[in-house]
């Protein structure tokens, strides 16, 4: 059995760890609330953009736009596919990073002709260690997502797409289903699919006059980049929220384990202390008996 000093040292060490896990839990909780508010504050604007795009497509379903081209004339093997992969800058977030990287790895194996745009230090280290080429100039943090960062990311990707250097772009991120469930998703970012914009006209729908100047194509090409920014921003915030939520759950589990260990160590300490006291009493009694025998002699 360990002595009381060793047990006290272990108790102190676990208490120090418990303070850290509790602090990390509180920090992640605060960041989660902040990120949810950021998303809710900007959602109305981007939902309006989506609604306007649906409205234009409802009136002009055959509109010509580079953002809606299908690339059906190209073989799948010839298409250059871009993947935006959103991971975390830090660990201690349960299976959050593992799930994203696993899905990304599966997609890369399906499409050898790809470009990889990785957000988050852990993701960059993961692919670099495995010798998988990533875009070196694409270097963004995922901490505290901002619209400006989403705009910069979107502009880089859109420019490559418009130049024809990318035929398709997908984004891999994590969405929050509820407080205890997250889901890793892959969504096609470019080209857009008209079917995703609910352009079917209801039977009793009265077609209104729609004036788009200088032309429907120009208006659409102006709206789409902002819509892409909104999509990327939403994915960044969702992923950041999931990271914080996963870290909260990991820290909660770690704190529970630490408390269980402290409970067991308290019992061990009390037993060791009791054994030590018993040993001391036994030694005192034995010593007293020995002295008594000496006096009789």
Which residues are covered by each model-predicted region?
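C-terminal beta-strand-loop-alpha-helix "lid" module of Rossmann-like NAD(P)-dependent dehydrogenases
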Residues: 1-297
